[in-house]
Design a protein with these regions (language model features):
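Membrane-interface helix-loop-helix junctions at transmembrane boundaries of multi-pass membrane enzymes
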Residues: 16-26, 66-75, 173-190
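A juxtamembrane structural motif centered on a specific transmembrane helix
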Residues: 17-21, 216-229
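Hydrophobic transmembrane alpha-helices and their immediate junctions
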Residues: 159-195, 219, 224
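Membrane-interface micro-motifs in multi-pass membrane enzymes
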Residues: 1-10, 149-152, 157-161, 203-209
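Aromatic-anchored segments of alpha-helical transmembrane domains
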Residues: 31-38, 85-91, 191-202
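Alpha-helical transmembrane segments of multi-pass inner-membrane proteins
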Residues: 1-40, 44-58
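Long extracytoplasmic/lumenal interhelical loops at the membrane interface
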Residues: 98-160
Length: 229
């Protein structure tokens, strides 16, 4: 999981440095991303890391423009990014056409299919449930009945239940609205990349990877003088 750790570390570093980031730092982050991809061949964190580094380069260094904050529609999308991501994930799972479903499933290495199977096998309860996923056999090989749910959003619903999911979406939406209100463009871009990552990867709300839980814990004491960006 080194590639996932690097991805979240990169996003966290970009959020902390913000407009103070230098070309040398961006180059170092790019080289670290390329090296990690060569070692692990993990595509999702690699492509998303390249995307956010490109955004930061164009936003801060080349055009010196806050693309999200200065665009009315992107600002609205940012406010409700987590809710929109959940809606899109559920649409892909239950309402997308056969061709679109198979395209997304293939692009995400069967993770969409596993999300659908997770809903069918375990369902969604109000208070959540304890689930033991079947992943590998005693020899370390993937089993034929592998059923791990990779999507952070689907995990939230299936494992934590509707009540916790509602609270988490409410809290995360408050976080997004806060950063929109204080015009933290790079922070919003990084959070947006994390949201996209979380649609098909399970680390978004895991503390040892992602800072999102820390943002929620500081939700009611955040102020415009903090050190983020």
């Amino acid at each position: 999981f080194a590639s996932q750790r690097l991805f979240f570390a990169l996003c966290t570093y970009l959020m902390f440095r913000g407009k103070r980031i230098s070309y040398l730092e961006l180059l170092a982050l790019l080289l670290a991303t390329i090296y990690m991809y060569q070692q692990t061949s993990t595509t999702s964190p690699f492509y998303l890391s390249i995307l956010i580094l490109t955004y930061v380069l164009f936003s801060i260094k080349i055009f010196k423009k806050e693309f999200i904050i200065e665009n009315f529609w992107l600002k609205k999308i940012a406010n409700y990014g987590f809710i929109l991501a959940l809606i899109i994930t559920l649409y892909f799972c239950f309402y997308s056409s056969g061709n679109l479903f198979h395209l997304v499933d293939q692009f995400t290495h069967n993770r969409l299919r596993l999300s659908v199977e997770g809903f069918r096998n375990f369902g969604v309860s109000w208070l959540g449930q304890h689930i033991i996923f079947t992943t590998m056999d005693i020899f370390g090989n993937f089993t034929s009945n592998y059923n791990f749910i990779d999507s952070s959003f689907v995990q939230l619903l299936v494992i934590d239940g509707l009540i916790v999911s509602t609270f988490m979406l409410f809290a995360l939406t408050k976080v997004m609205k806060y950063f929109v209100s204080i015009r933290k463009d790079i922070v919003l871009a990084c959070l947006g990349i994390m949201i996209i990552h979380g649609m098909f990867d399970p680390q978004m709300l895991v503390l040892r990877y992602s800072p999102l839980i820390l943002f929620i814990s500081r939700l009611f004491i955040m102020n415009s003088d903090n050190n983020i960006e």
